[in-house]
């Protein structure tokens, strides 16, 4: 193709993504667009086509990114090249959304005609505005009995400040309004900027591991062009590779001779190691590099740490490989080896949040067939010892002896909670219950309020999101930055089963709530741990002091069943004999702890009601 032809082709490209709150119909709309543009034959069509992971279909959420090329013949007779980049909608995956938005010029904002604007919609719209995208509002599910498109239209204008007078009224399920959306993309989404003659600059927005071709990068070409045979350089680490193949997804991978400015596609270059490719990195040509990398990409810091252990310790190396492969597609997953007396060899992993943790756990179990145990999540504490030493501890079992601890600092976050006015009371009550300190409150408009609190990160990782969403009917949007470390009265609580410490059940708690939380966990474990042949005491202890105890009663055979009447001393003899047997069993017996016991330390629902 000549430079002139490439420039004309660039004018016809439209890169866009779909942003929406969970369940507002994003994946269904993507399916309809694929059908309307005849990208996928009706024989191959299936619901949530872009959500290729079983897990995504089951949970009805989008986790990974997918980028697809479609051809659309517009009413003006011209054929346009659309690149649809699918985005996740959950708060844990905000970074994935920001990556995919950086590869677009426009975004379709899908809002449910019955539910209206929700928290995550807002968060994603702000990300789109940060990337200077043209936003096309679409009011979806207009065929629902509870739909109120006019109210939602006003809401979009008042809350987000977008002109919604031309918002398309659609129903992705019934296929209403799809053509209008496609026409609006042609008219309103700008063609990609960028110079096809400039040095290559391409943004990596996702990567997938392929056993035969190595790491496959999903890229958006910002300037220049790339073709097989080129020598590319990754700008973050200076490593060079030879391009073996480039192409696009339709959703299947299709080879191409080149990818030019504005294109979204994949690139394979025999990249062997997972760690070389950083999502958000810039690809350029080794012999004619770009002057500066693309900006706006940050290293992700994990919020939540938890131990992951294979139930079968011989699977340790398989688990390491599995985590390395997951890390390739998920720049936000961190892990390092660790050992536990109770659980053996495993890994300490860092996650973005609790949904992220859940998803990784399920993917390890499903895709790699590894049965595993996961411990309760925690954050990184600074522990100052009486010798003047500072330790960084993210695992409660590594906490030093309480007598040697001088002080403990924990991370606080500056939490910005945007919420409709009627829920301000509920948000303030929740934040205070979670040991938050009020900072300030601003009114954004007549209805929305921005509340700022300083809250310990440890309180947020438990169930702050869920509590916030339920106490505000899902309207609160929440964003946080780690602000500082502060001294806190924290203690390490150990759980003892049958007199033995279970290191994987230890956790850190504020002194004020230690008694209640200890009591709650002991009661929970009593319900979860199966009864044994002998009595099992469960104790919660701080140092040497036992703060709560509960006993699991022994299973016992009725040894008196064959004594019909008869002498009481005969019965007593049988009972004494049974008692001696149980005592002997107790001294040598060990207690199996089921996976739910580790997770029960997680969900502190009841203890929130008590606080």
Curated annotation (Swiss-Prot):
EC number: 3.6.5.n1
Annotated localization: Cell membrane
GO cellular component assignments: plasma membrane
Presence of keyword Nucleotide-binding: yes
RNA-binding found in the keyword field: no
Keyword terms of this UniProt record: Cell membrane, GTP-binding, Hydrolase, Membrane, Nucleotide-binding, Protein biosynthesis
CDD domains attached to this UniProt entry: EF4_II, EF4_III, LepA, lepA_C
Span of domain tr-type G: 11-193
Pfam families, sorted: EFG_C, EFG_III, GTP_EFTU, GTP_EFTU_D2, LepA_C
Family per record: Belongs to the TRAFAC class translation factor GTPase superfamily. Classic translation factor GTPase family. LepA subfamily.
Chain's role: Required for accurate and efficient protein synthesis under certain stress conditions. May act as a fidelity factor of the translation reaction, by catalyzing a one-codon backward translocation of tRNAs on improperly translocated ribosomes. Back-translocation proceeds from a post-translocation (POST) complex to a pre-translocation (PRE) complex, thus giving elongation factor G a second chance to translocate the tRNAs correctly. Binds to ribosomes in a GTP-dependent manner.
Name recorded for this polypeptide: Elongation factor 4
Native source species: Streptococcus mutans serotype c (strain ATCC 700610 / UA159)
Lineage: Bacteria, Bacillati, Bacillota, Bacilli, Lactobacillales
